């Protein structure tokens, strides 16, 4: 639908994109690792991966406390440049498109609550090829503060014309779960981004599934199924 449209549906599902619908979390970790190396910073890639899902500014501050603004901008620019070289390797997770279609077919508004850069989100949307199943989407341009702050979820809700009480959020990172919890939105977490079920549940996930296909197979009994009931 988009841009800027409100579909008039009374309930909806918000989806994170990277690591949730698109198999990209480890590519992001590698892109950040290379960006840090370019600045002479030796950051363990496992530590980087655990921060993927945060906004770039918060990821850098978490891994390199006290990093200057200039270096932070250089790191973000380098990450974007390196990540773009991985675009041809990106793939949607199995059944990601079908999951979006099933939610839309159940009469739910579907929003991509992504804080990705606009050009990265364009690539992801083309890969998903979900057409009219998606009612609204966001990018990093739509939020003042990045995850785990809930700004991007609130921006997506605004585009859908819904409130936090009307939706469920699906993500793959601890930061997704925390962002949802900050505004009282139930979070369904997927482990396909590389974070364990235990960590996601500890962060507050209401339900945990392996990947989009696993969630789709259990959609009727999930929090999403209850929304559409």
Model-derived regions: residue spans:
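Asp-based, Mg2+/Mn2+-dependent phosphohydrolase catalytic module
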Residues: 1-11, 104, 117-229
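N-terminal helical cap/lid subdomain that shapes the substrate entry/recognition surface
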Residues: 6-106, 122, 130-131
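Conserved phosphate-coupling serine/threonine residues in phosphotransfer and NTP-handling enzymes
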Residues: 20, 114-116
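Short, flexible loop segments at the rims of nucleotide/cofactor-binding pockets, characterized by
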Residues: 86-90, 115, 186-187
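Residue-level marker of regulatory loop/turn positions in helix-turn-helix DNA-binding domains and
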Residues: 92, 113, 145
């Amino acid at each position: 639908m988009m841009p800027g449209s409100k579909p008039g549906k009374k309930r909806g599902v918000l989806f994170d994109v990277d690591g949730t619908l698109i198999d990209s979390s480890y590519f992001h970790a590698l892109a950040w690792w290379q960006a840090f190396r370019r600045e002479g910073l030796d950051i363990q890639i496992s530590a980087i991966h655990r921060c993927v899902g945060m906004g770039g500014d918060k990821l850098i501050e978490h891994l390199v406390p006290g990093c200057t603004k200039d270096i932070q901008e250089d790191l973000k620019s380098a990450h974007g440049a390196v990540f773009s070289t991985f675009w041809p390797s990106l793939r949607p997770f199995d059944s990601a498109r079908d999951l979006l279609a099933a939610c839309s077919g159940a009469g739910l508004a579907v929003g991509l609550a992504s804080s990705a850069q606009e050009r990265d989100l364009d690539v992801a949307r083309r890969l998903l090829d979900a057409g009219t199943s998606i009612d609204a989407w966001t990018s990093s341009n739509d939020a003042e503060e990045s995850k785990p702050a809930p700004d991007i979820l609130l921006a997506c809700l605004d585009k859908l014309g819904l409130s936090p009480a009307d939706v469920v959020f699906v993500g793959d990172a601890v930061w997704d779960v925390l962002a949802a919890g900050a505004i009282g939105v139930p979070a369904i977490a997927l482990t396909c981004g590389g974070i364990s079920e235990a960590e996601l549940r500890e962060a507050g996930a209401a339900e945990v599934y392996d990947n989009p296909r696993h969630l789709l197979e259990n959609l009727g009994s999930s929090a999403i199924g209850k929304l559409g009931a």
